[in-house]
Amino acid sequence: MNHFNLKLIKRIQNDLIKYNLLKPKKSILIAISGGQDSIVLLKILSILQIQWKWKLSIIYCDHQWNIYSKNQAFHLYKVSFQMGIPFYHGVTIKPLRTEKSARIWRYSVFQRIASISKFNVIVTAHSSTDRVETFLYNLFRGTGVQGLQSLTWKKNIQFEILPNFARSKKSFDLKILSLESKNGIQTYSDYNKLQLIRPLLNITRTELGKFCSNENLPLWPDLTNYNLSIIRNRIRYQTMPYLKIYFNCNLEKILAQIAEILYSENLYFENLSKKIMLKISFEEINSKKLSLSLFKILPLALQRRIIKFFFENHFSKILDFRDIEEIRYYILNLSNNSKFL
């Protein structure tokens, strides 16, 4: 292996330690597509596996978006067989017409496999370039700081609660440790620990391409990535090249740095908001209350975060900017005699 590839592996290993992404002796599920980035990720993790003593497995999610997807899955099966790594293949049975529906379906596949096969970590091959493209995608769509931080190093995957398979006699792994909720619905402890990890966020797509070329890795490019009807692909092949040529050739590096800064700052404000929530909110029988006097003296940025956090955690309701502002104005205009919301 040449010097460039060794140096790249060292950088990734340093990021694993720096951001506390992966630990030794973990069972890791690697989500791959067969393209350059995911195959490089698979190769690097298989090299580091010797030192970190991981148990690796591969998952390929077939969205049925092109006629060659079955051939792509067979190619990946052969790769996994040659490497001696277990292979999982998920195939959708319903049309997936949007990126959001595809992501929800993928996460449901991750959920089932993680539950049955006892995985706590799923690793994806999102690169620094993907992070920049997602930054622009969210910016064009309209978002706040949390959206602009783009792809993050690690993310807890949230799932819908599943039915009680033991009571319904449906087929499932009944040996999984479970928790019983008040309404008779069963949820599984493994799900709460499931994390999505992105160890390549400091590596550009160009660097991954060079590694791939040096190692002569077996690729099967995903044809969906070239479909310009998909917004992300237009950003990749049209918007980014235009911005680099006419505005700043180092734009990718600059936007990646901004995303990393926003990630760190958002993490700080999230932790601060949680600590404040413990001070100004409390629960009574069948109710959750918020101290208005303490809320009103908070800075504007924290007021918005507290409202968002309060409704998400107590009522499982996702608020947009307009909702948050309406609630905030309502609270601020309440009489000073009102102590709680």
Swiss-Prot record:
Q: Name one GO molecular function term.
A: tRNA(Ile)-lysidine synthase activity
Cellular component terms (Gene Ontology):
chloroplast
Which Gene3D superfamilies does the entry mention? Answer: 1.20.59.20, HUPs
Q: What biological processes does GO assign it?
A: tRNA modification
Q: Where in the cell is it found?
A: Plastid, Chloroplast
Q: Which residues bind ATP?
A: 33-38
Domain of life according to the entry: Eukaryota
Q: Which family does it belong to?
A: Belongs to the tRNA(Ile)-lysidine synthase family.
The free-text domain note is:
The N-terminal region contains the highly conserved SGGXDS motif, predicted to be a P-loop motif involved in ATP binding.
Protein name stated in the entry: tRNA(Ile)-lysidine synthase, chloroplastic
- The species is Chaetosphaeridium globosum
What is the gene called? tilS
